[in-house]
């Protein structure tokens, strides 16, 4: 699921470490499986990244200029991407409760999530030696300041799989798209 954002703050250590992203998109992701399906491969993950980056649905990325034709994230390389693992997307209502039987096993989901984030960073040209596992700059001087508005800067920031996803974000409106890839 994609959600447009003006800026976002995501908790990555269950306590007090937040990473920040500027104007761009949040990607909520869950990995589902049914008993008859084959395991999710790197090829399938790369395909999902391609759909994410090449689908022309965004018309609002640049407040400085109006655009008439939808653009893809590929056409807006300066926009930030905030990836949030979101197992609740895999919930199905049964009776009066929600069940999550379609989610892949937690260890499989963690590995798929790490690979997906890696493929997004590679596709966006992020130098992974300069960022930590969440995509935050290793150098404090490169990190956005904790106060004020965050300028977009081609960041690919990701939450920590299995942790509580404390999320704060601002958006110009409910611009949300759901993809089943």
UniProtKB/Swiss-Prot annotation:
EC number: 3.1.-.-
Pfam entry (one): Tyr_Deacylase
Binding partners and assembly: Homodimer.
Gene Ontology CC terms, in alphabetical order: cytoplasm
Origin: domain of life: Eukaryota
Family: Belongs to the DTD family. Highly divergent.
Protein name: Putative D-tyrosyl-tRNA(Tyr) deacylase 2
InterPro entries named in the record: Daa-tRNA_deacyls_DTD (IPR003732), DTD-like_sf (IPR023509)
Function comment: May hydrolyze D-tyrosyl-tRNA(Tyr) into D-tyrosine and free tRNA(Tyr). Could be a defense mechanism against a harmful effect of D-tyrosine.
Key words of the record: Cytoplasm, Hydrolase
Compartments, as annotated in UniProt: Cytoplasm
SUPFAM superfamilies named in the record: DTD-like
